[in-house]
Amino acid sequence: VHQRIGFVVGAVTFSMSVLASPTLAAPSTLVGSDHEPIEVQRVQQGTATPPQQTAPTRPLIAVAHRGAAGTAPENTLAAIDEGHRLGAETVEIDVQLTSDEEIVLMHDTTLERTTDVTEVFPDRAPYDVGDFTLEEIERLDAGSAFDQEFAGEPVPTLREALDRLQEHEMNLLLEVKEPSLYPGIEHQISVELARSPYWLVPNAPDEPHRLVVQSFDWESTEHSKSLLPSVPHGLLGQVPKDRIADYDWAQMINPDHESIDADYVAAVQSAGLEIMPYTINEADGMWHVLEMGVDGFITDFPETGQRAIAEFLEGRADLAADEESEGSEESVELAS
């Protein structure tokens, strides 16, 4: 049973001591739908995490990569809106820290590729994210590099993204980029999430995860899990099959889609973890991993992904119906 950060469902009160201390919350009581109190434990850095649980059966999902990076500027509110418009239930975004320790959405560790930073700050090479304040980054245009239609689109903060996602009732796959460059970013993220307890309440077992935190830095991911034990965490990259059991604190492994096969998918799932490979933009590739048995996949084109999943499920249902029909015919023949 996962612990949760202290808040009260319904009234949504939260101990704001989280904002000033590594301790994320004082002990408090959750009130369930049946009004029975549920004790909530103190969550501290280094708290032991609960044992791995068997992965529930959740619907297949196509995660909108960096928003919907195929049709809107990545890691912007416009991309989140586009993902929502295209029917995505879950969005993946990347976060890093500014020099004044504000959390912003950005994939690359430099600002050059996706913004006009070289024009606004021509003497600030190499344009590392961590060398700029939030106020400076807010002056940048993160849309024009993708298309002039999005000129003036700003680099959003994590808080702005969380608000927009909640407004759309969307789920979040949150990637922590290069955490070794930003000591303490795991705690900064946990503090930001604590401002909106909505993100700390897991969805039902038959629904997509409301929030998953992931990174290629597995030590950072484990530390984040100790801070946010109620939140599922994922390992980006391919964990060797003989080491999957070592990561019993994780709930997900998300590798490059070209690095896996059906045996690897089965190994991950037999350990009670889910698997959602990245980044697949062609329908054939989506079908390929769906046939392996994955729990979902990450794509720049969520509309294509949703269509592939729908067609895959329809085909599987038709196959099951045919097999059931054949079985019924055989039973009739045997009876006669």
Where are these regions (language model features)?
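Phosphate-group recognition and catalysis centered on beta-loop-alpha active-site segments
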Residues: 2-11, 15-18, 22-336
